[in-house]
Amino acid sequence: SRGLGDVYKRQVADRSPEHYESREKEYAQCIERLGSVEVPAKMLAIIVEALERKPEQDFLGDMYMQLNLGNHWKGQFFTPYCVCKMMSEITCKDIDSHIEKQGYLSICDPACGAGATLIAAANTMKKCKHNFQNHVVFVAQDIDRITGMMCYIQLSLLGCAGYVCIANTITNPLTGHVLFPNEKEGQELWYMPMFQNQIWTWRRLFQSMGGLGGTATTEKTVEKEHFYMFFDLDKKEEAYENR
């Protein structure tokens, strides 16, 4: 059931020829195996509701460990979210100058699991009034495809921009520019939908042209956007403008 939602979201975010056909085939196989799209749709709705009610959590990671699904041979002992939150609050400081200079920064977790560290970083950025959707590239990598997909689902639903790489970080690490990762043999890249928005598209364009692609360029080209929403079931929707 996990695969159906993953494949659909990737097809929306990544329609490159080298990925599209294989993803369409996997999508069809998931539907055939499950018998219908209703089960994964209900599961996705549960995840969405959980993250809407409480963004400050690693919902899938906690469930994964509570069900004793972790593989100790792969070192799957997920860091508790409270620890990830503490680390993000310690490290996510003095970032204004970096964003002002380049327009964005990248945050990488080479052993992402279900994405707790990156989720905590996104929430810390939001707490500090930084629009992480437009100014942070989230890069995740994990050797385990299932946990990597859990990370992809949660970061995508939280509106993060970036990608997840399924591969061994030690023997097959990501290479290339952070905006243009090289997908090597043995790697599987999953691009988050938000990474295809107008601002990141302009940044990749300017980077490919040799420009800086920083704040001044992209924000003059792309007006402040109001359609990136954070949801809270107990409050009205809040729109966060670019900073």
Residue ranges and their predicted role:
Residues 3-8:
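Short, small-residue-biased leader/transition segments that mark boundaries at the very start
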Residues 15-18:
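Long amphipathic alpha-helical segments that form oligomerization/scaffold cores
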Residues 21-90:
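Conserved Class I S-adenosyl-L-methionine-dependent methyltransferase catalytic core
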Residues 60, 70, 96, 227-230:
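Intrinsically disordered, low-complexity regions
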Residues 81-185:
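Conserved S-adenosyl-L-methionine
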Residues 154-243:
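S-adenosylmethionine
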